[in-house]
Structures are given as C-alpha cells and as structure tokens.
Amino acid sequence: MSELEQIRLANIERNKALLAALNLPTEAKKESVDPEVAPKKSRKRNSARLESPDDGSDDSAPRTRRKSRRLQGLDPEANALKQEDLGGSGELKRLMQQLNGGVKKERLSGDLSLKEMLTKTGLDEKEWSASLGQLFGDGSRVSQGDFFDEIVKKEEEDTKDIDIKQSRDNLSGLQLGKMSKVTKERIYITAVHPGTDKRIVLAGDKIGVLGIWDVDSDNEPLQLQLHHATIPALCFDQNSNDILYSASYDGSVRSLELKTGKSGDVLDLEAKKNASVGVSDVANPQPHLLYASTLCGHLIRKDLRTKSTEYETLILGEKKIGGFSVDPINTHLLATGSLDRSMRIWDLRATETARTIPGGEVIDTQFQMPHLQAIYNSRLSVSSTDWNLAGQIVCNGYDDTINIFNQSDYFLDMLNDGNGTEPVKKTRRTRNSKLAEPEISDQELPEIKKPSVRIKHNCQTGRWVTILKARWQQQPLDGVQKFAIANMNRYIDIYSGTGHQLAHLGDALMTAVPSALAFHPTQNWIAGGNSSGKMYWWE
C-alpha cells in the first residue's frame, strides 16, 4: 500500500470519528444505484413533468426536519454544539474555535470611525486615507466655488490686494437681468457681441441653428439654420465686429454679416477627398487668417482670401482637439486641449514632415507638424484652453481641475530639468514687444511639471450638459484678468488670474446649468446658455 493511500484511509477514519462525536441522527438510507447499470431516463418531457420522481425512499419512514432554535426558546446565537457533545475531542474543539474566530459576535452600535471599521489594521491613518481618496476621487463632485462665502471670509483677513477686493465687490453684485429661449436645442457655444451700444448674444445649438438675441429688445430671438450639424465654436472677425464665423461638426466654417444677413462658405472640408471632417473650434487671430481644429487631431490654416476648398492641414495628434487658443500677443503660438490627456503649446512658425506624434504614435507622413513648444500631461482629457493678454493659459478637463499657467511655466520651468540649470530671465510682455523664446532641444520633451494655480472644480457634465469651458475676459477695463466657468450646482464661478474667486452667481430662476458661458470682452456682462436652449443674461 502506498504512502498516499495510507494517508487517505487515515483521513477517512478520522472523519468518521469526528462525525460519531457529533451524535447526529442519521437519515433513512437511500437505495444505492449503480450508475453503470442504472436505466436511462426517458426523454419524454411532458410525461416526465407529470410523474413524481422515484428516489427509492420509503414515504412512511420518519425524516429529519430542521427546527428553529428561536421557536424552541433557545439562544439562536449560541453554539449548537454543547461542551459534552464534543466528546472531549481536542481536535474538534480546535476546529470549532477556528471557525468562530475565537470571538463572540456582537451587534455594532453607536458612532464608528472609519479606522474602526477597517478589516485590516496594518495600515496607518495616512495610508488608508490615501487609499480611500484614490477610490472615490477625493470628492470629485465638489467645486471650490461651492464654498465661496467661507473663502471670502478667510481671504478678507489675508488678502491686501485692493483690485481683487474691488473686483469681487463689483462682480458679486451682478444680477440676473433677463433670460430668453434663444435656440431650439442644447446650446454648445455662446458669444457676446463686442459692441457696447447694443447688447447682443449669439448661440450655436446642437442641430446647427444660430440664435441671435437682442437683450434690450422685447422681440423674439432670431434663429438661423446655418449648418446641418452641431455648432461648437463662434468667433468675430479681426477687422469687423459685424462679421461672425461659425464652425460645425459638418466639416464647414461659414461667415455671417450681421448687418445684411448674408452668409457664405469660408471652409469646406467635405469637398476635398480624404479630408478631416468635423470642426471643433475656430479662431481669427490675424486679418485674412483663420485657424480651425478638427475632431481627429488636425489643425487647418486658412487664408480667407482664397477659395473655401483651399487650405493647409497641420497634424497635431490622432485624437479629438476639444479646443484651442491663439496667443493674442505672439500669434504664432497656439495652445490645444485634446482627448489624448494633454495640453500642448505649438510654435506655428516652424513645421516639419510629421513622422511620429510626441509620445511615440506613428502617423501619416503626408502632413506637416508644427514645433512643439511645451506639453502638460493631465490625468484625463483636456476640454479647453484659453489665452489672455497677460500671457496666462487657463485649461480645464475631466480631471476636475482648473489649471492656470503663467509665462514662467511654459517658457522657463520646462528648461529646468532638476540638474541645477538656471532658468532664463523673464521678459516683460507688452503689445509692442514680444517675448524672446528660448531654444529647446528636440531630444528632450519640453514637459510642464505643474501649473502656477490649480483650482478644484467639478467638470463631470454627463450626457445632457454641454462640456464646461473656462473663458477669459479678453480686454478687462478694470485691469483684473478674470475668467468665468459654469458650476454644476447651477451657478457661475468667476476667478482671477491669481486663482482668487471673485463671484459665485446664482438665482432661483436659473434652474439649469449655464454650461456655455461667455464674457463681454470689456464690460462685466456674462451670458450663459443651458441644455434646453435658454440663455441667461447677467449684468
């Protein structure tokens, strides 16, 4: 007999002894049936369902039934085995103690701390707090703007900036002046006419309708069917405020003369074979020059004096560009926010044949790629970027943060690799003098380590709310650089370029999130459109 067989037989005998010590009543023995000689069951389904199964047991024999210890007046939590039933078996006692864990079960009551509820006590307080923060996102559905009153109360003691306090008083006093149904469907983009004599708001919706609302008039807003798909971007012409450019997911950019109502094709991507269709953003930084981004990572550079089918294609990536912005001072610099989880700054003066996208992806070599000036890697996709006159870039995305980058972040910090390299001295930025840009080695990826200001903000819009985008006031008369962004709790948050919150605007009549926001370029007027096509005007 082999050693393995001896161990098996010993286990069988030990198990029999343990069962005998339990003194359990035995059930009526069932007739054993040899599986080899057992008759095959009939496949007649109907008759099999009506006939009762015959297992060979005697119906008259008494059967063991389970009994409730509670109905018998016994403690249901007590151990079913009495001490004398153990038969003095030390092995069985040891097994039962292992099953029960050696601890009597008791109901938990009162307030319990999170540390008391942890099953593993090997982690210290900092470790389990960090673990929970990773699981639940550290309260990702909370925005800093929700605590505006507490922030103001604290900053009044610390902040001595008179401009910030005065701007906060002015913006916090804005009131909901008017509201109107401007478009048929969800508003994707809002623009405020730069003029001050008449307050006009324009909005592009989901089905390609452009809504024009005269705030000072009681007439119904005008609705124009400019495109047959979503309008995600609007911008005014550099030479004339009465010319509006609208971009659409149908792959076109059109111009509209507001005074005459005449509209024409500016860019048509569908007319060219194998072209990238779907325009996500548009800008007119210089006279006769138009930039447009696509849903597949391309940048279109268009001379407005040429035909709509004539343009230059630059490749910036393989994924959707959610939005871009051109530096208002150095118009050759462009910042993009993309679905590839990055914010990138490009120098459009130098281009080369594209071989690989920064990051290693192999791409089509038929297009040119501009020089990559700097890159900031985000945890999730970046929804938008916007540049102001002070050289600051604001971007936000699905990582629930608003990031503000100063000049020192994207021109200087990327050169300091931690080896003691001295950064380049700052150059004062004016309209007449452009910032001298440092040369960057092509062998090193110019990565921005962190922003100058980071603000917690809930950007989880879901399916029915337009993506939130932070937008600067282009030319503030009070000299305070500030931007506005919608709050998912149906508010409008306004922040300064230094990260100070200036206002938290809300009203009982604003019953939906004004996700598509726009500042007037100079005045403290704000327009916000929601998912039902309604527009709110704050003044």
Swiss-Prot record:
Residue windows of the WD repeats: 182-223, 226-268, 316-356, 377-415, 462-505, 508-539
InterPro entries given in the database record: WD40/YVTN_repeat-like_dom_sf, WD40_repeat_CS, WD40_repeat_dom_sf, WD40_rpt, WD_repeat_DNA-damage-binding
One cellular component term from this protein's GO annotations in UniProt: nucleus
Region (Disordered) location: 22-89
Domain of life (superkingdom): Eukaryota
UniProt keyword annotations, A-Z: DNA damage, DNA-binding, Repeat, WD repeat
Cross-referenced PROSITE patterns: WD_REPEATS_1, WD_REPEATS_2, WD_REPEATS_REGION
A Pfam family: WD40
Molecular function as annotated in GO: DNA binding
Gene3D superfamilies in alphabetical order: YVTN repeat-like/Quinoprotein amine dehydrogenase
Biased composition (Basic and acidic residues): 27-39
GO BP: DNA damage response; regulation of DNA damage checkpoint
SUPFAM superfamilies listed in its UniProt record: WD40 repeat-like (SSF50978)
Job of this protein: DNA-binding protein that binds to both single- and double-stranded DNA. Binds preferentially to UV-damaged DNA. May be involved in DNA-metabolic processes.
Family: Belongs to the WD repeat DDB2/WDR76 family.
Protein name according to UniProt: DNA damage-binding protein CMR1
